[in-house]
Amino acid sequence: LTVRPGEKLTGYYIEKTSGGLLLHVKRKPQSKDQSLPLKGLSIMLDPGHGGTETGAIGPLGLRYAEKDINLNLAKKLAAELEALGARVYLTREDDRTVSLEDRLAMSKMMLPDLFVSLHANSMADNVDISKVDGFSVWYREPLAKDLVELLYNHVTGSLGRTLKGTHVRNFYVTRGTWTPSILLETGFVPNPQEFEWLTDEAEQTRLAKSIAEAITAYFRE
């Protein structure tokens, strides 16, 4: 799909019908409610891992693994987005195992205006854990690039996070073309300093607010 310069398309998908193939193209939605800038928009949050899939392990081991960090942040971010008028869906609301296929299928079924997968990073065993930190954003489809750059710059700037960059990668949950689909790596769980920041309730709230601000700015453009 080739998009003309200046067109603000945020999604497309092909539907098979009895008459052939139907191409759906979506333009960026915008709320006209100044007090609720995300009113009428739907956002899907994807807390990474869960259940038997713990994700990265930090200083407290399984007592507070990446899966818990991701879910706590997702709930805080959901509250921030709902306060701005958005309808928010979560791929999981508790500590359960959800396959990558099911996560992407939920996105395809709901067709949200935005899909955000929340993760925290790990690292190799032979790396000095005190020297690896930072925030990064990942995506696959070019239609997510504007959002990625805006969110990355806002979060790292407002919170003073170490820059780990924006990256193109074929992560399964970012394959959706029907909406901007991105994956956040909020920090490195094995790093004790990063772990303390990632698990602190006040810092989680600050991060959630910063992400919500960036999302709001994106839909106002």
Identify what each model region corresponds to.
Residues 1-3, 45, 70, 107, ...:
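Buried hydrophobic packing residues in well-ordered domains
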Residues 2-36:
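Surface-exposed edge beta-strands and adjoining flexible/disordered loops or tails in beta-rich
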Residues 24-106, 110-114, 124-127, 131-133:
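Active-site histidine-acidic residue metal-binding/catalytic motifs
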Residues 49-52, 63-64, 93-98, 120-125, ...:
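Solvent-exposed loop/turn segments at secondary-structure junctions
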Residues 64-72, 94-101, 141-146, 198-209:
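Soluble non-cytosolic domains of exported or imported proteins
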Residues 75-86, 108-112, 143, 152-160, ...:
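Sec-exported extracytoplasmic/periplasmic mature domains
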Residues 117, 122-125, 136-138, 167-221:
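Active-site-adjacent mobile loop/cap segments within catalytic or ligand-binding domains
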Residues 129-146:
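A short, gly/pro- and small-residue-rich
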